[in-house]
Regions:
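Charged low-complexity interaction tracts in eukaryotic proteins
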Residues: 139-146
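Short acidic/proline- and small/hydrophobic-mixed sequence motifs that coincide with surface turns
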Residues: 108-112
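Membrane engagement elements in two modes
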Residues: 26-97, 107, 118-128, 148-200
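Bacterial N-terminal signal peptides
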Residues: 11-21
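Buried hydrophobic-core signal for structured, non-transmembrane domains
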Residues: 100-102
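Cysteine-centric segments in proteins
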Residues: 126, 131-137
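Bacterial N-terminal signal peptides that target proteins for export
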Residues: 2-13
Length: 200
């Protein structure tokens, strides 16, 4: 019985090597999840993205499903290559809608949950940078939560929302819906997520 000799083109071999190398690099740095015009990453740790879907419109928001492993603030990195301005009336582009669905895997109850937008990491986002939870617009019925009954929003000297009047025990879920607008779009910005435990 004769064995057939297989000759693989060098380009095919090189392509396979690069493909598997890219997979390994992505696994090491943290997976990028895509939805709408954006990618989302948990590469800074403290939580894990389980899934992402949606386009970012009000009717079809970007739904981000996460599990939190601790009670320390975590950073979601949001990136886009499409920074061209669009009309906010189109309900997509520089204005998009998100729903964050979280599971408490920290082992501690959460009595509040905060979100803060930052254009530069660890630098408060003020009015001048154009990034906000749609600060100048009508947010009626655009911000809601399952798990907390109320929220407060602070726009200066930072863009922050804190959801209150509820408790998410270990193993339980909560969800938060809100718009994000960036009128001076950048390729990368950050969403700080802050589960809060009882003070005593």
């Amino acid at each position: 019985m004769r064995w057939m000799s297989l000759r693989w083109p060098l380009s095919l071999i090189t392509g396979c090597v690069l493909f598997f190398a890219s997979i390994a690099a992505q696994a090491e740095s943290g997976k990028l999840w895509s939805a709408g015009r954006y990618t989302f990453s948990d590469e800074m740790g403290g939580f894990t993205i389980i899934g992402v879907s949606g386009k970012g419109t009000r009717q079809d928001p970007i739904i981000l499903t996460e599990e939190f492993h601790s009670t320390t603030p975590t950073v979601l990195i949001i990136r886009t290559e499409q920074t061209n301005l669009k009309d906010p009336a189109e309900d997509i582009g520089i204005l998009f809608h998100m729903r964050v669905e979280v599971t408490n895997g920290s082992g501690h109850p959460w009595v509040e949950f905060g979100f803060e937008l930052q254009e530069q990491l660890n630098v408060p986002s003020d009015y001048g940078d154009g990034l906000s939870f749609y600060q100048p617009g009508d947010k009626k019925d655009a911000i809601d939560s399952y798990g907390y009954a109320s929220f407060s929003d602070d726009f200066e000297p930072y863009d922050r929302m804190i959801f209150r009047d509820g408790k998410i025990d270990p193993g339980e879920n909560a969800s938060f819906g809100f718009p994000i607008a960036d009128f001076t779009p950048k390729r990368t910005f950050y969403l700080v997520q802050d589960p809060r435990i009882p003070s005593s």
